[in-house]
A protein has these predicted regions:
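Acidic, carboxylate-rich catalytic segments that either coordinate divalent cations
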Residues: 276-295
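A basic- and aromatic-enriched beta-loop-alpha substructure that forms the phosphate/nucleotide-
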Residues: 99-178
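Methionine residue identity
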Residues: 1, 25-26
Length: 295
């Protein structure tokens, strides 16, 4: 049974530490200098996003349980011209789940110059959680939340860690890092944002290999938990400053310290440690789905 949606927080502050933040994120222990991190959400765009979510609910007859930012605004290093990557989870009324033929389980809005909006149906999301899908796990820990059913999402986040399989996360992030490094960082002049698109997944691999569990979505938190070299931290922070003040297409000469670190990390990560299978029980996901759909 679909429940009435609670009143949603509507704070427009730019930083992840305030009410735009996901309240379920673990706090970062500051043992080394922190790199900069900003999550700018224009109040006018936020209102437009909420209006889009409302329109999706009306057009498709669904309830959006959760909507968050999934791209650079969630990672904490958006450029002035970065778009908004909005991702959401939704549930249908009970009748939808009682049909013999499979139904479409994705909703996608046409991409425009500002918004990229798409979402997954809850059963699909739970199937992906059972398979330890890193993308879904990142969504659940986004520091920028546009809407959520607090009770349902608290329960879902409580289930998620038991389904995290380190080797799957490791393969996902290492593949992402290699693809971006080989595709964009081989010339003497490089697109600076691609450094961050390699550093983020490589540090996620380091986080996993350190036994810390699912890597955080916030890049600053990821750096704080995996990098303690002050010179390297300064290099990363300078790279972030360039990314945040320049456009998405900013090019410049290679940054030798960052480049050397990436090459060393790729060599270091090119192995498969032994990890235990996740201990999550799929019956818990079945019960969760039943509770949300049937009330």
């Amino acid at each position: 049974m679909l429940k009435e949606r609670p009143a949603w927080a509507n704070n427009h502050s730019a930083y992840a530490r305030n009410h735009n933040s996901n309240p379920h994120m673990m706090p970062t222990t500051k043992t080394t200098p922190m790199v900069r991190s900003e999550h700018p959400i224009d109040p006018t765009v936020r209102e437009r996003i909420i209006a889009e979510i409302d329109a999706i609910e009306r057009a498709h007859g669904v309830q959006v349980l959760y909507a968050c930012e999934s791209g650079s605004r969630g990672w904490g290093f958006a450029s002035p011209d970065s778009d908004y990557d909005v991702r959401f989870l939704y549930v249908h009324p009970l009748d939808w789940y009682l049909r013999v033929e499979p139904q479409r389980d994705v909703i996608e809005k046409p991409i425009d110059d500002e918004l990229d909006v798409s979402g997954w149906e809850l059963r699909k999301a739970l199937q992906l959680l059972h398979r330890s899908n890193p993308t879904l796990l990142e969504w659940l820990n986004s520091p920028v939340v546009y809407r959520q059913d607090a009770h349902i999402m608290s329960d879902l986040r409580g289930l998620a860690p038991s389904f995290f399989y380190p080797i799957k996360g490791r393969h996902h992030y290492l593949s992402m890092a290699k693809k971006n490094f080989r595709g964009y960082l081989q010339d003497e002049t490089v697109r600076y944002k691609k450094y961050l698109y390699v550093l983020r997944p490589l540090l996620a691999v380091r986080w996993i290999d350190a036994g810390k569990g699912m890597p955080p979505m916030r890049f600053a938190e990821l750096v704080a938990g995996t990098v303690d070299d002050h010179a390297l931290l300064s290099e990363i922070d300078e790279l972030l400053a360039i990314k945040m003040r320049a456009g998405e297409a900013e090019y410049g000469p290679r940054r030798p310290a960052i480049h050397a670190f990436i090459e060393a990390m790729l060599a270091e990560a090119d192995h498969d440690p032994q990890y235990k299978q996740p201990q999550g029980d799929p019956a818990d996901l079945d019960r969760f789905l039943h509770r949300v759909v049937c009330g």
